Amino acid sequence: KDDYNSLPSKVIAAFWVIQQTLTFKYIFKSDDSVLLQNDKFFDTIIGVITRMVPKVHYGGKIVNVEIPYMSKYYLLHPELPKDMIIQSTKYCTGSLYFLSSEAVTNLLSKRESVCKEYLEDYAIGLNLDKILKTNMLNIQTNKYFTDFEDFTS
């Protein structure tokens, strides 16, 4: 199904295909509604990631949900349930995040749990083992990416 609510299933399916067909250290995922503003971003960020000790497995613009709350995302996406609770977790926003191959393997082992969620970026952070989130890299994505809507206005 090709709708907003199916995004967690589509992303985890894409991760599975990538894992089955490619050898990779990291995978980058971005929204299709953002435009890269700096051509050197990926060269720079890959350099940073590969030099980090201990190894970083997950990064992007970090959201730290300290207290569970009732989501209001249905106001932007009416197809979402109105009673969706966002649990306490750390996750990276969907505009851009990256995962190590180990993190992808970990998430694929939790495929069913990821697919039960409605918000893809949140589902990734919620289901990724905490040990793989101990050394997250915070990226100020708004410095490197622009929403397509902002670009066209």
PLM regions and their residue ranges:
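Active-site-proximal specificity loops/subdomain of glycosyltransferases
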Residues: K1-K25, D39
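Alpha-helix C-terminal capping segments
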Residues: Q20, I131-L132
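Conserved catalytic core of nucleotide-sugar-dependent glycosyltransferases
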Residues: P8, Y26, S30, V34-L126, ...
